[in-house]
Amino acid sequence: MTLPSAARVYTDVNAHKPDEYWDYENYVVDWGNQDDYQLVRKLGRGKYSEVFEAINITTTEKCVVKILKPVKKKKIKREIKILENLRGGTNIITLLAVVKDPVSRTPALIFEHVNNTDFKQLYQTLTDYEIRYYLFELLKALDYCHSMGIMHRDVKPHNVMIDHENRKLRLIDWGLAEFYHPGQEYNVRVASRYFKGPELLVDYQMYDYSLDMWSLGCMLASMIFRKEPFFHGHDNYDQLVRIAKVLGTEELYAYLDKYNIDLDPRFHDILQRHSRKRWERFVHSDNQHLVSPEALDFLDKLLRYDHVDRLTAREAMAHPYFLPIVNGQMNPNNQQ
């Protein structure tokens, strides 16, 4: 039997809310009118949706329409309920309406428009200060959703929209997000491979908000070391091997022992033995301008096997790495 675990913060948030806050299965969707929106151009497609830039013809305002592919009603309700609960939260994409296509009966979510520089293109070009600035903005969104009893479960560059001109960040795609209830066992088939925490890879289901902090750590590592992605596994098994090559196998086994987790036998042949590496060994001439002792200390406190050892979003914001941001000593516009 694996041993239980609970979040260090915001543990009982949902227990103190009315059931209708988190009971999305009984949620009744308030469908708006699709005729108010005209699609302008396709922005992209995901596993579960197609995304378009659109215009609200009654207000002439730009917006973004996410047309959902056929998926369980329950999953759609969960995404809508979470977006409604988080509406108005710091740096959380704003859901404006939910409509149904009259012909296909396909649901579509209408969002505020964000100038679409996705982080991925941008974040290999950012300065040290800008990396700190945007990660701080992302942490505001994570602390907000965690404080509201919600785990995002798919934090990655692709789901972070940045309007670089206006220094505006939005955390998007809440399709995998879920309500946190201590003691609940969750599906480990969430997040994108390169950003999956060790708990998912070893099939530990009683995870919590700290999963998002691992994913944030992976983003930080890829940004400061200019290595995208930082842990580049070819499949979910290889993903854990890539992590173990950096964090060490002894440390992995200590984590498994602590929670009494049985490793899938497939790992025995591929894991081998790896010593823990110092973060300094990833520093080279092309990335040294982005690396500082406080950046490495911050990274070290995020990329921990044991989810309870990772910084929370609130603790992360208090880390010295963000002092230049908190003090606002510099203006990002005049940073080289």
Curated annotation (Swiss-Prot):
Domain Protein kinase as annotated: residue spans: 37-322
Compartment(s) where it occurs, according to its Swiss-Prot or TrEMBL record: Nucleus, Nucleolus
UniProt keyword list: ATP-binding, Kinase, Nucleotide-binding, Nucleus, Serine/threonine-protein kinase, Transferase, Wnt signaling pathway
UniProt xrefs under Pfam families: Pkinase
Entry's EC annotation: 2.7.11.1
Reported cofactor(s): Mg(2+)
PANTHER family documented for this protein: CASEIN KINASE II SUBUNIT ALPHA
Name by which UniProt lists this protein: Casein kinase II subunit alpha
Organism per entry: Drosophila melanogaster
